[in-house]
Amino acid sequence: MRLDLYPAIDLKDGQVVRLRQGRMDEATVYGVDPVRIAARWAEAGARWIHVVDLDGALRGRPQNAAAVRAIVEALRQRHPGVRVQLGGGLRTLEALEAALALGVSRAIIGTSALEGDVAARAVARFGPDRVAVSIDARGGFVAARGWVEVTRVRAVDLAVRMREVGVRTVVYTDIATDGMLTGPNFAELEMMGRTGLDVIASGGISSLEDIRRLTEIPGVAGAIIGRALYTGAVDLAEALSLCGETRDT
């Protein structure tokens, strides 16, 4: 199965950082120029860039719009085939609309998927290709509001609910493995893959072997890769080749 790879750019105070298990107090800064880093991944052949507004995720509203706009505009000029998906603090239709107005191709709904009918309304308004739902889990249960609160909702159950209201794509993050370079939670991903959704896996990728195993899980359509790229544990061009991805530059 083809797997789309999403190099990650996590923004905190305008800088590119990586966290460990979502803890803001364990942020490692990998750069102060997100545009340059996005260009680096695009030049390696990426089709997508995954951008997260960490400040927005914590505060409940977007905080790094200027940096996101700069990334989108630079890619449009130099690498027009590369698309951006954005998450973090997008909990209302208004926030989603503002994110899409920045030029991103897909906006990711966070905590709001648990509350009311935001996901259903977003799909109806923007279409299933323009929105996705982020399902972040600890021990199989959904974590909300910047991963601060762990609910009693099972991740798989939320995924099924999202499918029933028209959502097509979910980003599944296993918090325990996020930023740890210990390998993804393959067992949870196999369960998520059986929901009928296109699942984008996030958390724990540490090697090309991890990526190869993800290509074998039905329903897993993509993978977000962060710390492994920034530490050099994985070469993006090699990973893209393994996944059968090529892009004309």
From Swiss-Prot:
Q: Which GO terms describe its molecular function?
A: 1-(5-phosphoribosyl)-5-[(5-phosphoribosylamino)methylideneamino]imidazole-4-carboxamide isomerase activity
- SUPFAM superfamilies under this entry? Ribulose-phoshate binding barrel
Tell me the organism: Symbiobacterium thermophilum (strain DSM 24528 / JCM 14929 / IAM 14863 / T)
Show the GO cellular component annotation of the record: cytoplasm
Write out the pathway annotation from the protein's UniProt entry.
Answer: Amino-acid biosynthesis; L-histidine biosynthesis; L-histidine from 5-phospho-alpha-D-ribose 1-diphosphate: step 4/9
- Is Cytoplasm a UniProt keyword of this protein? yes
| Record-annotated disulphide pairs | none
Name by which UniProt lists this protein: 1-(5-phosphoribosyl)-5-[(5-phosphoribosylamino)methylideneamino] imidazole-4-carboxamide isomerase
